[in-house]
């Protein structure tokens, strides 16, 4: 056979997008994406896409903590305290961070506490140290009164059991890793393939092996380019030894690489020359699906499935290799759920309009965590304290509020925003939900929506606002706050989901009630039923149920399924003060497959929540 006849020219070039789409379809048929999932230590999971939805299993914090250095007190003892009329308290102990004071304090007593220290069981406020003065080894003068719960981080104020910590396909940014660690989680499932890189070519010499290659030889350089670019993604990369242009050696190198890796990259041997053997090996070993891309440089690119694994052949010329990696290989890996961080900066800086008023701290620039919604450049700052790592991890940006502004930043004002991570393409805006309802919603969207989801669980008024601006793809709104929904009917499809709300009470050390954000239906109800009681702020029914169960509050407002959980766990039956029938309106943008979303959502409601939620079609 002549040299000419042994060549196999590349005749049919494929568009990059078509090649990627075709490969994804073929790889999905063999369950390839699932094979890329690895359970790894949190330290190894940074910047990876999570392969599971993780719900909070404990409250954070799980005990009352001080958020300042000062003195834990009974707020009742300081009602009359002022600069002119200080109150003398007896100092009965000290608690450092990491410690817990297990004894109750008596009338007129206090305990010194560090920031983060646990409070005595019946302490209900903390006086900052700057408002006090020592009057002896066991005496403290207090020059200010404090309110119930002031400077206290209540249990579940950051995360409650059943909260979503990470949604499947979320990129595990550093703050999300910290939120997982705060749950006691040390390992997590992520998409993190093992990749082997094999340079080929009889002409190649390993850098450092000789002072200068002999004529005809060159230093191998492309593997350094390939490895360093791939390592901007969530992968484990190993580079093999240089393989000469010998069919048997290439076959053996492929066999070795397939044993321990999910994906194999060959460099070189992909063109039509007599010594280009990689494409011949792939043709005989598996299914060669791509041979030639319609790009320059980079035409001689290969892709094959061998032993149910992905093998890619890159051109040998380094510039071609670079172009194919950026235009084809890395986009293909991203479609396989492998996250790449190729931008030069972790943060991007934009200006956006405030969805709600915002207030800077007095005398300081305030960097407030927020939800950035890039569909129309809006930003929604959240209420938070600096210990709230879970709340922080659920946002995707920070708003800068400059010091020196008197009063509030008004709605619609442009503010500088630092956005971190990738843009969220699918917006879910929701009323605060029970743990079971939340799980039903998340399970539905995980199974159907193949986009990055931003879950904004900030109450019905926020959800309605985002729906009116056509920002929310899914909005879940309480019937008590759903005025004006008719105007959205041409843009959203909808269903109604019935839920029963109960106001319950029990005996507790303090007559206190959970107070919800005013943006939620729970806030409206708590305004009515918590009058005359001390107030403990909560965000969700999940947090309220935990505090009620543990006796931190004597009254709360819950969806009935959370009450069932309280009764079954504690064995006592709370007193029902009132029952309220409510309906959640679930809105779905008409450009989505709402029929499928609603069908799956209702099935999940039925399987997760039992008979407590009854779906009704609008």
Walk through the language-model features, giving the residues of each.
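Flexible glycine/proline-rich
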Residues: 13, 17-20, 32-43, 47, ...
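N-terminal hydrophobic or amphipathic helices and topogenic motifs
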Residues: 381-385, 391-396, 403-471, 511, ...
